[in-house]
């Protein structure tokens, strides 16, 4: 993004040490397909024909992505743009000549994305790019889900917990929130499908929604037992590789158990690929608790987060490929 030059920017550019943030943002500058994403959003972006002209679309998209990478609320994002030269440089903001989007503008941009279902559009655009580059294959899918906690407190304006979130028990612990269900490409570990549900929705119920229809093999943990017998999947000509429950393995005769355990270990190694995008979203992007109310808003954010996670996963391959 073209940037204005200023003394502060020149001074920052001349510093000798490159921080981890500098390095990450420099990589994202190159791997995010900015012209392609802006073109996807532009037809619906307000033209500012009445009143104050809107901020440039690409600048607002960059600020929105900064929010996702650093888990910043709207007020914190506004403050970060004043505090961090690295973030301002990435967003193309020079304080000497440019206005900084305030928290309301940042909020309104996110609401605009949600209103037009554009987070899903951004996810689809990134997926299309990765498929064109030969990085996203379609021969096999791993299905999995993770719980993301929602605030359980009733100390809010509505004086109630989010009615679209629910409790579920995992092991001996109860969790309140939603589930992020993903379909992941076996060969690359890239996410090709994202579905959001309440936390009490059984994993197996979303299996059909997580398949793109071209896969030959499907892998899942024991939470997907019986997927092949569900009516919506009865006509799928795929090889089902679903983990056997540990209690069943444990109760097998020793001879059968000795045969089953190596197979289960091999399948577990294949399924382990699915943990990488979850790790990036929850640990690198720090998305461990829901920020918004309602499944629609939070699922929209998940589409953005997993699109960005995909770019992180293949950043080396994209950086090695000239042009975009």
Describe each model-derived feature in a short phrase.
Residues 46-52, 95, 292-296:
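A short glycine/serine-rich beta->alpha loop
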Residues 2-11, 216-217, 222-296, 300:
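Helix-centered, glycine/charged polyanion-binding patches within enzymatic domains
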Residues 2-8, 57, 75, 79-82, ...:
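Polybasic low-complexity intrinsically disordered regions
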Residues 59-71:
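Alpha-helical support elements that line or immediately flank enzyme active sites
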């Amino acid at each position: 993004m073209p940037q204005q030059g200023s003394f502060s920017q020149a001074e920052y550019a001349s510093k000798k040490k490159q921080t981890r943030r500098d390095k990450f943002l420099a990589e994202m500058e190159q791997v995010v397909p900015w012209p392609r994403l802006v073109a996807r959003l532009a037809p619906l972006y307000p033209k500012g024909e009445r009143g104050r002209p809107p901020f440039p679309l690409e600048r607002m998209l960059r600020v929105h992505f900064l929010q996702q990478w650093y888990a910043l609320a709207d007020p914190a994002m506004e403050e970060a743009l004043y505090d961090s030269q690295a973030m301002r440089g990435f967003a193309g903001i020079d304080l000497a000549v440019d206005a900084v989007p305030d928290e309301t503008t940042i909020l309104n941009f996110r609401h605009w994305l949600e209103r037009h279902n554009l987070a899903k559009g951004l996810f689809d655009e990134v997926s299309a790019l990765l498929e064109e580059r030969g990085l996203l294959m379609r021969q096999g899918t791993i299905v999995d889900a993770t719980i993301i906690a929602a605030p359980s407190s009733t100390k809010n304006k509505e004086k109630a917990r989010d009615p679209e979130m629910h409790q579920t028990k995992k092991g001996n612990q109860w969790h309140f929130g939603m589930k992020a269900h993903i379909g992941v490409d076996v060969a690359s570990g890239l996410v090709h499908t994202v579905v959001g549900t309440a936390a009490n929705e059984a994993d197996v119920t979303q299996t059909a929604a997580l398949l793109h229809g071209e896969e030959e093999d499907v892998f899942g943990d024991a939470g997907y037992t019986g997927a092949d017998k569900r009516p919506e999947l009865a006509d799928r000509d795929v090889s089902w590789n679903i983990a056997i429950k540990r209690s069943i393995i444990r109760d097998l005769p020793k001879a059968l158990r000795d045969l089953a355990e190596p197979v289960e270990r091999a399948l577990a190694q294949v399924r382990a690929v699915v943990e990488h995008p979850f790790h990036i979203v929850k640990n690198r992007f720090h998305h461990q608790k829901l920020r918004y109310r309602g499944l629609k808003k939070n699922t929209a954010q998940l589409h953005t987060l997993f699109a960005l996670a995909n770019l992180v996963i293949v950043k080396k391959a994209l950086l090695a490929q000239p042009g975009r």
